[in-house]
Amino acid sequence: MNIQIFGTKKCNDTKKAERFFKERGIKYQFIDIIEKGMSKGEFKSVAQANGGLENMINWDGKEKDLCALIKYISEEDKLEKVLENQQLIKIPVVRNGKQSTLGYQPDVWNLDSRKRDEVKLSTA
């Protein structure tokens, strides 16, 4: 499996997540969520792994007006709007296959001592 870290270059939690994996010698791929973002399939997979779209949104972030709009539109429109505006998502998003976490959660990123290059993300 390949660890993917979605975040921004300026985000401290994203930097801490990168440092966490780097210090343990675990290979990962960094994807800038503003420049490239997640594909629709990746996005749906992360939403499903984290209890739905509502849990992915950083309601306390800088985009208050956009968050307010998202609260009142249909589910299909919410998905499209957040997919278009991925800066609304809690970051970093750390993916390993179908498993993922939102935010900096080193306690969830369990290391498999037999394979230093793989990480198991528990579903806590």
Give names to the regions the model predicted.
Residues 1-24, 28-33:
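Local sequence-structure signature of Cys/Sec-based thiol-disulfide redox active-site neighborhoods
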Residues 33-124:
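Thiol/selenol-based redox catalytic cores and closely related redox-interacting motifs
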